[in-house]
C-alpha cells in the first residue's frame, strides 16, 4: 500500500471483509449495518463508537483508493457498500481471514489467529497459519504483515504498528468471549437456515 490507511479505514475495511465471509446473505452492507459492524463489542480491539459520519468519510476515502465500492440500483432500495481488498491485493480465502482478524483485533499470536479465524477459514494446524503469515510478510512490493515482539504479528495496511502496542501482551481470550463467539456462530447458522426456509415459500 503506497499510502497508510487511517484507523477508521482499517476498521471499516476489516468489517466489510468479515461480514462478506461470515454472513454473506447480508453483504454488501448499508451504512447503518456497517456502523454496527465497526462498533460491535465482540471480536474487536479496540472497541470503538464510530458515528455514521466517520464511517461515511472512511468509505469515501476507501472508494477513492479503489478499496471499496458503492452498490445501488436494481435490487437495492438503499445504497450498500462492499470492499475490493481481495481483488486489489490478490488475496485468497485464508489470506483474507488472517488479514481481516489482524485489522479488527490488532497484533496477535499464531495460536490466537488460528482460533479467531475459525469462522472464516479453518486452518488445520499452526504451521498453516505461519506459512500464510510468512507469505503475507514477503509480498512485493509492499508486505501486508510483519512479525512483532512476543511472537505476535501485525497488519501493515495502517502503516508500521504502534511500538507501545507491540510491547503489550495480548490478553488470553476469556470464557465470556468464547461463549459470545460460539453464540454468534450459532445465530449466523440460524439466520442461514431461516433464510433457506423462507425462500422455499417465495
Regions inferred by a protein language model and the residue ranges of each:
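Extended, charged alpha-helical interaction scaffolds
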Residues: 85-132, 140-144
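A short, conserved structural fragment
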Residues: 56-73, 133-149
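Short acidic, hydrophobic short linear motifs in intrinsically disordered regions
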Residues: 23-48, 107-123
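Eukaryotic, polar/proline-rich low-complexity intrinsically disordered regions
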Residues: 1-10, 22-25, 43, 48, ...
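Helical coiled-coil/dimerization "stalks"
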Residues: 116-120, 147-160, 192-202
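Short alpha-helical segments that sit at the start of domains
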Residues: 1-28, 74-105, 154-157, 167-170, ...
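Mid-protein regulatory/catalytic core that forms ligand/cofactor-binding pockets
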Residues: 130-166, 171
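Amphipathic alpha-helical oligomerization/assembly segments
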Residues: 169-200
